């Protein structure tokens, strides 16, 4: 069973939240949890992708390059005008002034609506416990209208994860974290981060993750001002 969440880009905004230890070097770390003053509008949180030392890829935060960008890597981008996209990075190590944040993680698994033909069961898609091929995997895609699609499931290969995202409507997608320790998607039914719930009941981490400081970086989804349920 796969869990899939659709995130309406017109009614929400996305924020990158650094963790206590990841990324290791950053000028503005913040609280490493959903800030208490923003909990009134938080609707979801989810895992942020491989650590920089594992991905060997780029990160931009608040317009500042934390790790140099790498061509050919799938990249979740927020532009300074608030627009979100997932792109195959082709602009070299420097992001340019129009990018507010960018997080890279491995080559795209879906691009222009098609599966990456080079998806395999090898370690290039992440190290797994006991070298298992089918493990917990998560990914993020974007549909033709700019809405985000998160997917996670146990017993997945990178190829089957890509198929889940493609069938859910993603035209571009990247793999996020793998293995049960790192895969989390939590929604909040009430303001103030009330009544949290994991996307899948078998997810290993508690649904209170990200409401206390976490070692790893993550993404938070907030309702835009004036938008109702």
Regions found by a protein language model. Give the residues of each.
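Broad, structure-driven detector of short, well-ordered beta-strand segments within folded domains
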Residues: 5, 13, 75-78, 140
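Solvent-exposed coil/turn segments that connect beta secondary-structure elements
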Residues: 10, 49-51, 81, 145, ...
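Active-site-adjacent helix-turn-beta-strand microarchitecture at beta-sheet edges
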Residues: 42, 46-115, 120
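Extended C-terminal subregions enriched in glycine
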Residues: 86-87, 111-115, 125-229
């Amino acid at each position: 069973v796969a869990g899939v969440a659709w995130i309406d880009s017109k009614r929400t905004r996305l924020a990158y939240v650094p963790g206590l230890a990841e990324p290791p070097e950053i000028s503005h770390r913040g609280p490493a949890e959903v800030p208490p003053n923003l909990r009134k509008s938080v609707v979801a949180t989810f895992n942020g992708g491989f650590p920089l030392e594992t991905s060997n890829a780029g990160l931009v935060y608040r317009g500042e390059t934390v790790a140099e960008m790498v061509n050919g890597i799938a990249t979740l981008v927020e532009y300074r005008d608030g627009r979100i996209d997932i792109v195959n990075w082709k602009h070299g190590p420097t992001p340019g002034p129009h990018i507010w944040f960018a997080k890279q993680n491995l080559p795209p698994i879906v691009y222009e609506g098609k599966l990456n033909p080079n998806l395999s069961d090898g370690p290039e898609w992440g190290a797994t416990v006991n070298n298992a091929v089918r493990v917990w995997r998560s990914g993020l895609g974007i549909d033709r209208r700019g809405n985000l699609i998160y997917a996670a499931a146990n017993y997945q290969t990178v190829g089957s994860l890509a198929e889940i995202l493609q069938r859910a409507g993603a035209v571009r997608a990247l793999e996020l974290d793998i293995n049960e320790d790192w895969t989390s998607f939590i929604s909040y039914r009430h303001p103030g981060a009330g009544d949290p719930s994991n996307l899948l009941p078998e997810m290993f981490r508690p649904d209170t993750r990200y409401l206390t400081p976490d070692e790893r970086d993550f993404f938070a989804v907030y309702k835009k001002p004036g938008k109702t349920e």
